[in-house]
């Protein structure tokens, strides 16, 4: 907009948009996005007047996290990592970018979302899209044939983000995978048990875990009349059933993917089926599906899986759902996805960036997904040697969003530090004594703070504890120094007791353990 009057009118209109959003108490992300647009318009106007206005904002699809949000994230990570470790997993790390050829051809229709980097001297590079393909590359490169690993790191997708719906271009994934040649369905059952434990401990609300098998899907497509070359693309369309009505999915199959209406209707008859071990038994008797060796192998494994899930006592949360497809190309066997049926509290909008999960219309949304990918490592091995793998990815951004909303609704204050005690003084000229005592506490492993003023008022020191949630104050005064004691104050109850200086460390540890 070169015309100054037009630019001023656009600024006025955009200002009204921002004010309206604020009055409607819209989400912070939505307001920030519109404010950024307003600032960009103002920057253009400033440029017309010979000034350069630098717009301070994060890149599209990214965000900053304040101390309160990070405290919540740390709590969530700790719960998840403890579950991973309880199951005997060890952790690895890998580069944030890979050779482009490492990632190409592994994600089906989602490959267009891979972030390519500008050529920096010969190697074509891309930012990692998930943690699974780099893990497979790591196994092949290091000739590892069995490992149980977890990996928590950021991944990148060149999505067109609508941050009001919690979609980002940079987000965390939390992956757990078991690699190795083992007896059928035992590692797969453990992955489902792990998901059950994590979601139960996070207390996000009611959930269910949907399971299916790629072999059953492929067998189903074959007997329904889907051409072999269209299996993967139809799989991606079926994967949208958690977000779209059947009519919309059918329309895509017929109009965009070229299936006949008759074939689409046959698919519908199967994808509407749900159950448990009983459904697996029924499908083995299905006159058409039982003709597919591939489907029968998947159904037989599904029966075995449910027998192990019964031993783990989690079948009340697991449903065999033939509509579950998961669009990623590398799955070869069992696939699963955990969805929240009722969040606690139900979020208005929640992030969905995890291994293939997106906003779901029929439930609060997917919070975990995964499956078996026995052929992926072989794609990287020069001799094509396969390492069977099964794993799960926790949709951590969605979890963070729900936990943040729970914190907003809770009366309990979120602490952003772990300070156990503040070293304070009741009189002036005691800075040296405060610093000496603080050093003693630090040396003993106590988390302690001291205010950076020579002569702070006692009231302001106590107020700092109230504001930040520090539970104890160690108060020094001239009399306390003479008597060799420290006055230890409980901030919540305001009770004070004189503690001999030599016993202070033990007393603080006892009270804060």
Curated annotation (Swiss-Prot):
Pfam families: HGTP_anticodon (PF03129), tRNA-synt_His (PF13393), WHEP-TRS (PF00458). GO terms for biological process: histidyl-tRNA aminoacylation; mitochondrial translation; regulation of vasculature development; sprouting angiogenesis. The keyword ATP-binding applies. SMART domains: WHEP-TRS (SM00991). Its EC number is 6.1.1.21. CDD domains: HisRS-like_core, HisRS_anticodon, HisRS_RNA. L-histidine binds at residues 130-132, 157, 173, 177, 326, 330-331. It comes from the Eukaryota. The keyword Nucleotide-binding applies. It catalyses: tRNA(His) + L-histidine + ATP = L-histidyl-tRNA(His) + AMP + diphosphate + H(+). One of its GO terms (molecular function) is histidine-tRNA ligase activity. Keywords: Aminoacyl-tRNA synthetase, ATP-binding, Cytoplasm, Ligase, Mitochondrion, Nucleotide-binding, Protein biosynthesis. InterPro entries: aa-tRNA-synth_II (IPR006195), aa-tRNA-synth_II/BPL/LPL (IPR045864), Anticodon-bd (IPR004154), Anticodon-bd_dom_sf (IPR036621), His-tRNA-ligase (IPR015807), HisRS-like_core (IPR041715), HisRS/HisZ (IPR004516), HisRS_anticodon (IPR033656). GO terms for cellular component: cytoplasm; cytosol; mitochondrion. Danio rerio genome encodes a single hars gene which undergoes alternative splicing to produce both a cytoplasmic and mitochondrial enzyme, while humans have two separate genes. NCBIfam families: hisS. Belongs to the class-II aminoacyl-tRNA synthetase family. Catalyzes the aminoacylation of histidyl-tRNA. This is Histidine--tRNA ligase. It comes from Danio rerio.
